[in-house]
Amino acid sequence: MNLKKYVLIILVFGFTFSCSKNPTSGDDEPGNGYVYVQPPETGDGWQTASLSDVGINANKIVQLINNIHDSIYQEVHSVVIVKDGKLVFEEYFPGHDFGYYGENYHGSYIIFNRDTRHNTHSATKSITSALVGIAIDKGFIQGVNDSIFSYLPKYVSLKNEQKSKITIEHLLTMTSGLQWNEWDVSVSESNHDIVRFNSSSDPIHYLLSKPIVTTPGTNFYYNGGAVDLLGEIVKFASEWNVKQFSQKYLFGPLGVSNYQWQTLYPSGITCCHGDIYITPRDLTKFGYLFLNNGVWNGNQIISEEWVKKSTETYIDLNLSWADSYGYLWWLKKYFANNKTYDSFFAEGWGGQKIAVFPGIKMVVVFTGANYVSNPPCDEILTRYILPAVK
């Protein structure tokens, strides 16, 4: 498969590269200042344990936190770790909220804590994928091979022979074949499709009016509008809007209430391609749900079949930050301590990441505000967190 070289940072997705300032040396030296404390149990459904209880070397984690405090890693707002089903680490750091019109896209300076909701940006896409899976599990949607127009009677006039072949799976894998320019153009330019989509009075019409440029299912074109289309399909099929559906079938069963979807203006449709605000501790529940085959506290929220289908490779990418793509999940092999760690992850602009490592039963969540620089998430994983796992 041929891919363009995408080089510009965009509003709806944050690249995660592995470069940053050089950290201090001394891999197993804890350094001075920070003292690790086991996370408290707050009644939110998480059982907690200490790092040593699950075989994680606390010294390397302490070194990481000292480096964040020393601004070696800047604008990291949270690091949360779940291992073996237990919440074993959470720390929060001050930094800037997202502000689209601010310098470096920074808004207000905030003292983040476990109750502070954070913008997840494009990590929201993986949540939308889960909603599609639930809609299929519940029988609202027949399957991923359904034509999108089976659920879009309002837009049937835009259907033609080529577009009739677009399926739900094509939207989930970013292979709809629709012409779309989102990765190789600045958000300040008039031809940036997601900006035009967001501000359209009818974003779905804007999307489906695009011509087909490749056969559906063959080429990867990152397309946030396609994810909002999935939200509209869930809405039509279930007769609940995305906010209602997610509360009933996902967030409610997870015991999550401190979250907020965003709404596109002037259309009023729910923004499913990005920007849900949620706490990192609750975001980790979502990652653990997929690590645990769709089960949370004994309840099967998403089918095991959907978890496996949505986190396997459909499109090979071979990019620096991802090897392949599933159903709105990225997949990557990490290398640390002469070991290979398979992962799937959700990722958003600025350093938002839900990294799931099935082989070692671990979930790591990051939030941050590195909107014009490379987020350090991958370096932190490979230099500190993965090597700390015994």
Could you say what each language-model-derived stretch is?
Residues M1-F17:
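Sec-dependent bacterial lipoprotein signal peptides
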Residues A226-I233, G274-V295, Q352-G368:
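Active-site-proximal alpha-helical segments within enzyme catalytic domains
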Residues A346-K390:
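Structured C-terminal helix/loop/strand segments within mature extracytoplasmic catalytic/sensor domains
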Residues S257-N258, T311-V363:
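Active-site Gly/Thr loop motif
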Residues G85, Y105-G107, T116-V144, L171, ...:
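Active-site SXXK
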Residues V187-S199, P203-S209:
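Amphipathic alpha-helical interface segments
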Residues N119, K138-L178, S209-P211, F236-H273, ...:
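Active-site helix/loop module of the DD-peptidase/beta-lactamase fold
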Residues L3, C19-G107, I136-I141, S201, ...:
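N-terminal leader/targeting segments and the immediately adjacent pre-domain N-terminus
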